[in-house]
Amino acid sequence: MENKTKRIKPLFVVDLLMALLGAASAYTGVEIHYAGHFQEHSAWHGWSVVHVVINVAWLIVCFLHCKHHWAWYKSLFKGMPSCSRKSKITLIVNFLFAATAFTGIGLLLFAEGQGTHLGLHHYVIGIALTALCLGHFIKRFSILRKGLRRK
């Protein structure tokens, strides 16, 4: 007897995880910023630990996401004659993600606590990333919703 149940494609699970972890990253990032201004250092530290754990998971899922879309990345290096508006925004999202990741890693390796200039840059770049990721997600939400349905 043939198994008729369809499985959800891993691509859509990865996309859903990207959205959930991205939202969690943004939330904990704002909590860190708030705690740095209005709460004790222990609250700032606690949110920082949660933020790092979430973002390590997000980074892993991001690599899986990029692997699924590797053909798009390869097309960039083959010299597309004209980059569409959608591709330009996706490129900016990629650039902001990399900038946020590198500043975050820099904070982990070199910062001595809260209130650093690098931390402020990380926060501002993270806000820009969040705004563009939200638009990126909204544009593709119907595709994700259809892909997550079992048929």
Residue positions per predicted region:
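Membrane-embedded alpha-helical bundles that constitute the cytochrome b-like, heme-associated redox core
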Residues: 1-151
